[in-house]
Amino acid sequence: MADQEPSVPGPPADLEWPPESGDSGAPTSRTIAGWVKWVIAAGVVVVVVALAGTIIRVPYDTFAPGGTLNLESRVAVKDVKSYPGRGALLLLFVRERTHVNLWSLLQAKLDSDIDIVKQDKVTGGTSQRYADQQAVCDMTQSQNSARVAALRELGYKVPTSPGLDVIGLPPTYSYKTADGVVKNIKLPAYNLLRPCDEIVGADGHTLEQNADLSKIVKSHKPGTSVALRIARDGQEQTVEVPVVAVPGTRLVGVSLARRYKVPVRIDIDTSDISGPSAGLAMTLAIIDQLTPGDLTGGKNIAVTGTIDPNGNVGEIGALEQKAVAARAAGAKVFIVPACAKDSGRAACLKDIAAAKKRVGGDVLVAPVSTLAQALQVLREAGGAPVRSSSSA
């Protein structure tokens, strides 16, 4: 069969073309009416498509390069001598859009700076409301860890205090049976507690560490409840949380962090930015405020990575988008988390390689695993040395 030329849409069949004209050469009323109908129909289609692209939401989130905050001017140390720096320690953030519409998804596909991620991968199977609460809590916990890590690095004693902070509430516990079937058990705390609730006590007992609550939970039979005394929004209340049995143990389904009595008042203003990835940057900014000299050497230093109270640096997401922000801010050094030796190492190394490509050869990309390593990077880049507990 011979190839056929593709058909090209045209005006309606009842519209004469070329248009008939009267003796004067002007279009007839029939011709004008036909064209008006065609234009209206085409306009309606355009409007419907535009509205559909705006209204219809898809299960994807997008991550685009955001900007930076100079933490040197956003960390304030009270009641002790401080030493403002001349350079900049840059917190990097990305712009996340959740549950985007079709037009936003198309725009993201055409922009190499924007990353597209399935929404359930971002939320971890939780609701968007919970994910938003968790992100705000992550920033609060990140600030707490930054204070502790920085002060310990400088030789301060930072003791723990009673109570435990809720830092995660997984909705389910998953495991494989002997025959390979995946089972999911719903965890009750997910619907009863909130991220960043403080657990003051359980069954009338005070709590100092995670093991204290675990011991109390294991003393209960499945189906009975633990009475958790919690503090939320400045008010205390008791919440009855059922205990569930999972292979080998019993749970209520809560991840916890210890609380600390910080000996120095340190205020940190990160505006409305949420998430855990600013931990290392905040830690370095606190250290720079509390030590003479300039930790940055007068340069713009971009930093990303989580921090724990012991100074360990953890991996983060959207590294490539943060690299774009670091380059735009004129950073000379970009400190990033080193890759752990686990199943995600290959993907992590790929992300670091992409970040190096984004910032170009003029920016040093320095992977670190600990706070001490980050301080070493800054010393080698011309920053003032810090007399710390790890370097003593």
Language model segments and positions:
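Conserved PDZ fold ligand-binding element
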Residues: V182-D212, I216, A323, G330-S343
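PDZ/PDZ-like groove recognition
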Residues: G155-P195, P385-S391
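C-terminal, low-ordered peptide segments at domain boundaries
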Residues: R232-A285, P385-A392
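Hydrophobic membrane-insertion alpha-helices, especially the h-region
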Residues: K37-I55
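PDZ-domain C-terminal substructure recognizer with occasional recognition of PDZ-binding tails
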Residues: S214-L256, A354-Q373, V377-E380, S389
